[in-house]
Amino acid sequence: MNPSVPKVMKRENNTHLLVSKEMNDTSLQLPSTTRSLSPKESNSNEDFNVDGNETTLQRISKDYLKPNIGLVLLTVSYFFNSAMVVSTKVLENDPDDIANDRQIKPLQILLVRMVITYIGTLIYMYINKSTISDVPFGKPEVRKWLVLRGCTGFFGVFGMYYSLMYLTISDAVLITFLAPSLTIFLSWVILRERFTKVEALGSLISLLGVVLIVRPSFLFGTPELTDSSSQIVESSDPKSRLIATLVGLWGVLGMSCVYIIIRYIGKRAHAIMSVSYFSLITAIVSFIGINTIPSMKFQIPHSKKQWILFGNLGVSGFIFQLLLTMGIQRERAGRGSLMTYTQLLYAVFWDVALYKHWPNIWSWIGMIIIISATLWVIRIRAANNETTAKDLTPIIDDEENSIPLTEFDLSDSK
């Protein structure tokens, strides 16, 4: 008999013993692993999760949040916009500052807000430099469009800030609801999109709503003088209200141009880059205006409340612009424009919460007219887009899918 055979058999027996021991150890651990599982959990692999809530959250995120992420971003952005608007209203209409000739003007508010916002954009861009290209000025081929976005953005925000001096928060915000109709008109002029009679009629009806907000004296007569507390909420002077409304309409034009430019740029520039140009250009223009316009005086905040309000302007403005740009880039124009109506809910809330002021009957009628006309136009336009082959391709993330503005002589130089 070969003497090596017992050694082999012994080695195999030892190996068998080791394997058996490991299996026994594993089997001893199995009850502790499965003991916490309920019958429902053990019979359903789909619903099983250690936390118990993750699957539900993932399903909600997949079915509702992700498909509508653009709408969510826009809704949240408009909340921060409302916080910024109400801070502006309080700063511009402080009765003590008005009585002592220390009223803070819109350009000063814009300067402070945009300086804070621009600093925030620089910090954000350099922290995320690995994911944001060409910091801090963006790609050379889109810089001229970013500059144009900043210039038109200034007119848009100045129109709103000026109108807040003489109109209620809800009235000033309501005027901006003309932006969707004006955007459609500008799309016809610049992008050569269709502009139907229905859309033209809807725009005219919206203007009727604006007239009810302005309430000119030749139509509504001279209003009775009200107490000083009411004057803080809104002016009773028809001339002041008319000028404020016209400046607000000029701001609406700027907003519409911003929307088209951002849609053209698409994702060729990071959202924060658009905010950066907007804040920088607005700060520069505001600084020049304060130092060249004789009636402008730079007022240093003299109370804790004013410092807090100025700080809120900068922080809320930064978040608003960032989320707004991200939302516009991710959502179709029709659905995205519907979210602007959340601003009205916020505005009425602030008017009531801060000033105990409900809109009067004419403002309510104007509100209903403007909203109804705009919704009507958007609905008709959406229906037409479904039946025509001339739709714009949604912007994804490259230059090929951008709206071809260049063929309309808007980019002469490079």
Swiss-Prot record:
Residues 20-51 are annotated as: Disordered. It is found in: Membrane. InterPro entries: EamA_dom. The chain crosses the membrane at residues 67-87, 107-127, 145-167, 172-191, 200-220, 242-262, 270-290, 308-328, 358-378. Residues 25-51 have a biased composition (Polar residues). GO terms for cellular component: cytoplasm; membrane. Residues 88-106, 168-171, 221-241, 291-307, 379-414 are cytoplasmic. Residues 78-215, 253-379 form the EamA domain. Keywords: Isopeptide bond, Membrane, Repeat, Transmembrane, Transmembrane helix, Ubl conjugation. It comes from the Eukaryota. Pfam families: EamA. This is Uncharacterized membrane protein YMR253C.
